[in-house]
């Protein structure tokens, strides 16, 4: 928000310097980001009187002028403007003056052999306009010419400063000059002199579909669209960063800046020409845009709308994007004599959706998005009509309003004890003292609140402009603290202070990350947003910034493989990575978020190769699978592998479903050779995916970590190997489970140590060898005690799997 200090002083009688005022506003929550001192544009520029004008002897387009600047002697200035002549008053930049608008310092010198001691300025050289066709002639801009030698700052309104304020979302009143003036008055106890908002005449009901909006129109005849607005209006708009257009549009913009209520003027004749029908108040409506409905805005940009956008219509023809921008075809032009003046309160949510959908953010939309008080909607329309009446001999042919208007406000209860408890005492020379009642009342009254005393405190009726922000008791307490000064209150912390802590699931997730890192894998983070895919049911987001980030990802492994490709192309020996992240499935109306741990083991993971004579040694299936085994052993979780042949990503003979506690936890396997070849990845590339939620559930069960004492064995163990021939589709995990069950209570450990396939066994047979370790806690086992248990194991395998014993 750009705030002109001169305009602000017209609204509130404040005498503070611009620096003091900026500090007060910043301390009160309106951060001043920049101060533009306009007087710097005209320092050293004074009123001059051209006494003579002669042709330059050495240049056809230059003139030699004698100019009186109020000094003892007149000065000679060489000027190149075609409109310079004797007898006029002009702004003259004297020697030493600096003109920031054109980055020029005036020096005495010569032009084509003739001395020149100054420069006659144009409006653009003073930073007042973007372009100028000649020098500024004061007789054309003002009726009363100041004395020669007078600084021109006041003459051109440059005795001003513009403050750039950062307005937070909870203070929409700060987007108006009246709102800032009220704030300054509350901070400085200065007197307000706001423009009077007259009560509006009777409004006729507007019988139209308004899509939840509060909508008012007025028919005004007798305007002149081609007429410029007065200089004071143009100056105020210029200070606020808005270009002047014509008197009608400028007045609507002025009311928006002054009161915070955006207005819009439609050309009545243009509407009739556009729709081909007579236009009355009932012709207007508000509705969602139709799919693929076209719209050309005031910026001449053609837009294709959809139902997310709310539009204002005339005879069902879209003439404005509600709260954002009007249409080019209904805009006020030089031939406009009759307008329909719109003043409305559109839903902040709908305006925000419309603005995002079309990619437009305007001065109007920024105000509607933050919320407007409906109490001033009609009053601002009347304010604009009064300004139009001052400019033109116009008349109003009717006013109409429809939709849900202002509601009866409910006073807020402010308890004295609650305020003192939350803020505490203020620090004074005599010690800490609670705020006095009259100080509290003075602060709230300065904000425009109406107070009524109660037994516990006050019943507070907030002003309409602050009801978007002040709707709870604590909001009123904050305002009191802000106006008194936060630095005036003593610092105190709640007692006792509760330290923060991690939940058991958060601790478990952090431990998982550490364990994977300890195995040599590097943790990465990838974007949750990806591009579209024909073969993947990805969920599209509503307003993507880029086509590459337009959908929610359904997996992590695709991006992980691309990361491996990039790293190997960068001459990395290998790439072993993992990520803890979310994937998304379902429909746009019902999105399902799933947490997983996904990773890739690719290439050489070792940093040195001295043990392999400098040669690359690819990890085999069991080495890669051992990474997961080490993590699960640290978590005291047991995984078993089940054959997996229907995953298109993985090698059909080298993939497994990982089972924990009888339920699938995820998968592990070698990348399918065809996919590895397409991506130019090594054949020994392995993928894994684990269900994060199930892992966290398993590691955070309350009965899981109960300490159980188990003494170290003091007697030796006895190991025996057992090789069996079984069907090719027999799972080693099933055999191990059967061995453990049959080997109780002496069997301490069993592991697969060999797997053999050969022609001598047959196509459908395979040999699997296991190493069994027997031990007793109390005595050294002899063969007499081991052999019966070992025979029991062999018998169980023969019976359950039709196993042929090889040893």
UniProtKB/Swiss-Prot annotation:
Domain of life: Bacteria
Single Gene Ontology BP annotation: phenylalanyl-tRNA aminoacylation
Homology family: Belongs to the phenylalanyl-tRNA synthetase beta subunit family. Type 1 subfamily.
UniProt keyword annotations, A-Z: Aminoacyl-tRNA synthetase, ATP-binding, Cytoplasm, Ligase, Magnesium, Metal-binding, Nucleotide-binding, Protein biosynthesis, RNA-binding, tRNA-binding
UniProt enzyme class: ligase
FDX-ACB domain ranges (all copies): 713-806
Organism taxonomic ancestry: Bacteria, Bacillati, Cyanobacteriota, Cyanophyceae, Synechococcales
Cofactor, how bound (note): Binds 2 magnesium ions per tetramer.
Protein name: Phenylalanine--tRNA ligase beta subunit
Subunit structure: Tetramer of two alpha and two beta subunits.
EC number of this enzyme: 6.1.1.20
Keyword Cytoplasm set for record: yes
Cofactors, names only: Mg(2+)
SMART domains: B3_4 (SM00873), B5 (SM00874), FDX-ACB (SM00896)
Organism: Synechococcus sp. (strain CC9902)
């Amino acid at each position: 928000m750009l705030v002109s200090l001169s305009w602000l002083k017209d609204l509130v009688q404040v005498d503070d310097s611009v620096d003091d005022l900026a500090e007060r506003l910043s301390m009160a929550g309106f951060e001043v980001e920049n101060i533009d001192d306009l007087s710097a544009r005209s320092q050293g520029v004074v009123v001059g009187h051209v006494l003579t004008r002669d042709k330059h002897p050495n240049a056809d387009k230059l003139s030699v002028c004698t100019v009186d600047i109020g000094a003892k002697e007149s000065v000679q200035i060489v000027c190149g403007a075609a409109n310079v002549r004797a007898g006029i008053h002009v702004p003259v930049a004297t020697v030493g003056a600096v003109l920031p608008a054109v980055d020029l310092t005036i020096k005495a010198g010569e032009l084509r052999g003739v001395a020149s001691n100054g420069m006659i300025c144009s409006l653009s050289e003073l930073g007042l306009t973007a372009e100028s066709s000649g020098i500024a002639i004061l007789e054309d801009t003002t009726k009363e010419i100041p004395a020669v030698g007078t600084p021109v700052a006041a003459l051109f309104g440059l005795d001003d400063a513009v403050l750039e304020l950062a307005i937070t979302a909870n203070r929409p009143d700060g987007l108006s000059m009246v709102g800032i003036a009220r704030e300054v008055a509350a901070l400085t106890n200065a007197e307000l002199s706001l423009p009077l908002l007259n009560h509006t005449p009777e409004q006729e009901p507007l019988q139209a579909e308004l899509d939840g909006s509060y909508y008012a129109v007025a028919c005004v005849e007798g305007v002149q669209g081609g007429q410029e607005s007065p200089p004071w209006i143009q100056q105020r708009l210029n200070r606020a960063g808005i270009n002047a257009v014509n008197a009608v549009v400028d007045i609507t913009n002025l009311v928006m800046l002054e009161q915070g209520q955006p207005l819009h003027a439609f050309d009545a004749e243009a509407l009739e020409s556009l729709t081909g029908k007579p236009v009355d108040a009932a012709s207007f409506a508000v509705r969602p845009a139709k799919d693929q409905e076209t719209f050309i805005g005031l910026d001449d940009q053609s837009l294709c709308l959809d139902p997310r956008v709310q539009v204002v219509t005339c005879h069902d023809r879209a003439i404005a994007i509600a709260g954002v921008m009007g249409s080019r075809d209904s805009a006020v032009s030089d031939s406009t004599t009759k307008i329909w003046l719109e003043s409305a309160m559109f839903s902040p949510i709908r305006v925000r959706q419309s603005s995002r959908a079309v990619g437009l953010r305007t001065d109007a939309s920024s105000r509607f998005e933050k919320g407007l008080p409906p109490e001033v909607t009609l009053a601002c329309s009347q304010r604009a009509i009064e300004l139009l009446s001052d400019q033109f001999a116009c008349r109003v042919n009717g006013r109409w309003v429809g939709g849900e208007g202002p509601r009866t406000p409910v006073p807020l209860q402010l308890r004295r004890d609650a305020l003192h408890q939350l803020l505490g005492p203020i620090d004074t020379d005599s010690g800490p003292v609670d705020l006095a009642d009259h100080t509290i009342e003075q602060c709230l009254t300065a904000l425009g609140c109406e107070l009524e005393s109660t037994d516990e405190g006050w019943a507070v009726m907030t002003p309409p402009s602050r009801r978007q922000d002040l709707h709870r008791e604590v909001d009123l307490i904050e305002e009191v603290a802000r106006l008194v000064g936060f630095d005036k209150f003593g610092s105190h912390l709640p007692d006792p202070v509760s330290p923060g802590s991690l939940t058991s699931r958060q601790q478990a997730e952090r431990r998982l990350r550490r364990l994977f890192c300890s195995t040599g894998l590097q943790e990465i983070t990838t974007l949750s947003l990806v591009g579209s895919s024909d073969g993947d049911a990805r969920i599209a987001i509503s307003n993507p910034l880029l086509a590459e980030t337009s959908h929610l990802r359904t997996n992590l492994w695709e991006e992980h493989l691309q990361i491996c490709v990039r790293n190997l192309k960068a001459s990395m020996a290998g790439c072993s990575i993992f990520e803890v992240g979310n994937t998304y499935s379902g429909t746009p109306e019902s999105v399902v978020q799933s947490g997983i741990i996904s990773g890739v083991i690719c290439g050489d993971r070792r940093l040195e190769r001295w043990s392999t004579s400098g040669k690359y040694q690819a990890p085999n299936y069991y080495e890669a699978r051992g990474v997961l085994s080490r993590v699960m052993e640290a978590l005291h979780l047991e995984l078993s592998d089940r054959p997996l042949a229907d995953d298109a990503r993985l090698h059909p003979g080298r993939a497994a479903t990982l089972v924990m506690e009888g339920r699938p936890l995820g998968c592990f396997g070698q990348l399918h050779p065809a996919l590895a070849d397409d991506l130019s990845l090594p054949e020994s590339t392995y993928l894994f995916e684990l269900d994060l939620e199930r892992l966290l559930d398993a590691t955070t069960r309350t009965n899981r970590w109960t300490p159980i004492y188990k003494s170290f064995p003091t007697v030796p163990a006895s190991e025996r190997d057992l090789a069996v021939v079984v069907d090719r589709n027999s799972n080693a995990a099933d055999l191990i489970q059967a061995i453990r069950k049959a080997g109780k209570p002496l069997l301490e450990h069993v592991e697969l140590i060999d797997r053999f396939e050969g022609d001598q066994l047959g196509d459908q047979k395979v040999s699997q060898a296991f190493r069994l370790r027997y031990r007793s806690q109390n005595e050294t086992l002899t063969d007499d005690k081991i052999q019966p248990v070992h025979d029991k194991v062999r018998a169980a395998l023969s019976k359950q799997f039709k196993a042929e014993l090889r040893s």
